[in-house]
Each structure stands twice: as C-alpha cells, then as structure tokens.
C-alpha cells in the first residue's frame, strides 16, 4: 500500500501538532481529526483541500513586491507546513525555483542573521566539537537519509557568509524534495560553524554565529573528521553532499572521504555532471561528439577543474587518449592560461595545465596568456565560465570565438546572476543568435531578429536530486565517478534539442520529476554493476524508485495512546 494511503498514528494532540511542520495540515484537518486531536476551535471552521490552501498561498506569494520577501514567505510556510510548501512549489516550479534557490538564496544568506525567524537543521559549532554526537541526537529528524552540509566559506560567488551559509543546505534539500521526490522527513541541513573571516559579520551585532576567525590546518581537519565519524555513527547509510566549501578545502575533503563514505561534492561533481550532460546534448544535436570539441574554461578552481576532469573522462570514453583529451582543454584563471612550467599550481590543476611546448608558437605568446589570446589561438568551440567574476566574456572575446566557430557553445555558469561572465542577451546579440547558451542562474528568453531563444539553466538541480533518488532506491554505499558519468548521459537523453534538433537544450522544469527518475535509474544501474549496491532486476529497481518518490499529499491521522 502507498504510504500516503496508510493512516499515520500520532501519540500527541492539540497545539503540538500544529507546531510540527512535517505533520501539520492547517485548515485541511478533517472534522474527525479535529475532534480526536483536540483541534476544535484552534482552526477556522472551514475544512479545505490542499489545492485550496495552495491557491490561497499562491495569491499571498504574488502579493509580495520583491524576491527576498517571497523567499521569506515561502520559508515561513516550509517551517509551518512542509506538505503545503512542496505542493505550492510543485505547482509553480519554474516560477518558484529561483526564489527558493539561486539567485535569491544568495541574498537570503547575506541577510540570514538579520532575517532569522525559526530554527531549521543543525548548527555544529567548533566550541562544541566534543559534543557532536549529542548535537546530532538533538535532531528531530530520526530517519535521515540525505544531509547537505556547508561551512559557509564560499557561498555561491559571495564568499564567506559564516552561518548565513545555512540558506544553501536548506535550499538544496528543498530541491531534493521538489525535484527528486525525497521525503522531507529524510533530509537534514547542517552548517559547520568554524568561525568567519568576514569582517562585516564579525562586527555585526546581529550576527548569530561563533565570533572568531576561521580555524584551519589540523584543527579544521580534525573537526571535519569528528563530524564525519559522528554522522555515520548516527546514520550509517546516509548520503552526504558537501556544499560551498572553499577551494582549499573542497577537493581535499572529497578525496579523503569519497572512498570511505557515501558522499559527493556538488560544486565539483554535480556541476561537472550537469555541464557534461548539457554539452553531450549540444553535441548530439549537432551530430558531433564531445571528443571533437576544443574547450576553454575561465576559472580554474575546484569547480572548473572538476568539470574539466569529467569532460576528459567522457572524451576518453569516446575513444581518444587521455593526453589527446587534455590537449583540447584550456584552463584560464586570473594569471592567464595554466601552463606546466608555472610554480604553485594546486594538485588538481597540474594535470590540466597545457604543455608550454605545445603553445609557445602562438601569436602574442607571453608568460601570461590571456583569455582572448587563448580564443584567438586555440580556437575553442566551447567556452565555459566558472570564475565568479562578472563581465569577463567581453564582446571582443565572443566575436573572436564566433569568427572561427559558426555555432559557439557558451556557458557562463557563475552564480548568482550578478556574477555571470556575460548575459545571454549580449552573447546572442554578439553572435547574431548563433550561440548555444546555458547559464547557472535563470534568465528570461532573449529575442534576436524576431526569434525568441529560451535560455537553458545549466543548474545542478537537474542532476543531484536524481543522484540522491538513485542512491536511496538501490541502497548504494558510494557515489562513484562512473555513477556521475551515468547521470550526465541520462540527462543528455532527456534533452529536447538532442532528441529532435529543436527546442531547448534542457527539458523544462515542469518535467523534472521524469528527468530525476530517469537519472536515478541510470545511477542505480551503475552502482549495482560496480558492486556498490545489491543486485536486482530492472523491474524491481523501477519499483523501488517509485516507492521512494514522495509526493506532497496529506495522510490520514489516527490517535494512539501516549
């Protein structure tokens, strides 16, 4: 029997039920439930359906004049009635996703302490490092299956937001549920409060975090280790998603734990998976392969290099050598093109640095090879921005790229919209509508020469909810690179452009449930093949995916004794 059709037996009554967001129905409690649970008189007389409630909530939502107020309003509903919150978001997913996550969540993080209203998730502060087990036991969520955790140091493109970074785990888990069907009862947002180096926060009398410079070195590593061990004592099978850790910590943490626990880093691996999936769709629509492309990155941090490594892996899977694949990928950061003779390259950058012997014949060659120089000499067919610096894809650069590539693929992926390398409107006008554009944050359609171009949002929300659903459905104990590659290929299979050569690069958000299920199946199949999950039939796997998919519907309640 479907869980939503089974009655749920509750041992408490009265106002306590109305204060429990996972249980509260508000005006939808039936007459029988109001009597049995001592709710008569605590609610208006009318008994409403969830759709009637959602209609009222939507009218209230539309009454707010700015996106931050809309975000706060939706969070208030989430903190009082989660089922209604997810029905409202499900009914209006394209309109509300930019409100509950990027770009609005960035402003919510910046103003987190100022706008704080009600607790959600767990804050684990460094001064409490010896009581992590007790803190985890304080959570009201006892069946946690997915955790999103941040230390708040690199929030989107906004930098160190301290505990204000909690807005990111809350928002990401909201998307796990609204896009991937993960029950909110199985999710837990966590912020690791290890101090902040943001002087504005340290001086802000309203800041609610630990007022101390960020810890680092061994202290930091030992704290992360204590957290990971405590989490797996409490919930041994949990999936952990690392979110918005600084570059200096993100890759080392991932490398340390990816083979010990079921975990992944969304900034590195999720961004890579959705970008590769989008590139595969674009290549399929053009009748080419990813291994045919020449790809330039602006931004050579952990996210950019993570995408580049995923692209190299996909190119190799298409039949070219690793060396050949790497020779077709050009990484540019603030110091110019990464070259193998540069000192102080980070370990994850070294394998992606171009051999200086391969490029010293370029026109205008110098020790600092600019992005424009790379475009003029390497003649890339794909340009990807993950720099977090706005406006760096200039008209000169885009026109230079278009001069040697009839249909350039341009992905300015930096978040939020204020940090984007170039707007879709500018890119399409500079290329007379010929560029294929995808962005990290949502943008309105662009009209060029009376033709309307929908802008694909190359957002991780197309990927990580399906990964989570697949892990839960098959009981995987790891998230491998091959599972992530499978998610990319599954996303490309959902592309309207790849299917028939027309339409948007990525499917509309209204189809996100089907996309997540398709990705979940592909991810789970690879997990089983690799021995990360128990073997099962395709039919039973699909049944498990459906059984794990939660829909925002009210359940019947029955009273049981204390």
From Swiss-Prot:
Read off the SMART domains from this record.
malic (SM01274), Malic_M (SM00919)
Catalysed reaction equations from the record: (S)-malate + NAD(+) = pyruvate + CO2 + NADH; oxaloacetate + H(+) = pyruvate + CO2
Q: What class of enzyme is it?
A: oxidoreductase
Assembly and partners are described as:
Homotetramer.
Instruction: Work out whether the entry's keyword set contains Lipoprotein.
Output: no
GO-annotated molecular function: malate dehydrogenase (decarboxylating) (NAD+) activity; metal ion binding; NAD binding; oxaloacetate decarboxylase activity
Entry cofactors: Mg(2+); Mn(2+)
| A Gene Ontology term for the protein's cellular component | cytosol
Q: Does the keyword tRNA processing apply?
A: no
List ligand-binding residues for NAD(+). 154, 267, 415
Keywords in alphabetical order:
Metal-binding, NAD, Oxidoreductase
GO BP annotation list:
malate metabolic process
Q: Which PANTHER family match?
A: MALIC ENZYME-RELATED, NAD-DEPENDENT MALIC ENZYME, MITOCHONDRIAL
Q: Where is the active site?
A: 101, 172
The residues listed in the UniProt record as binding a divalent metal cation, with positions renumbered to this chain, are 243-244, 267
Which residues are marked as site: Important for activity? 267
EC code: 1.1.1.38
Cofactor binding comment, as recorded:
Divalent metal cations. Prefers magnesium or manganese.
Homology family: Belongs to the malic enzymes family.
- Per its record, how is this protein called by name? NAD-dependent malic enzyme
CDD domains according to UniProt: NAD_bind_1_malic_enz
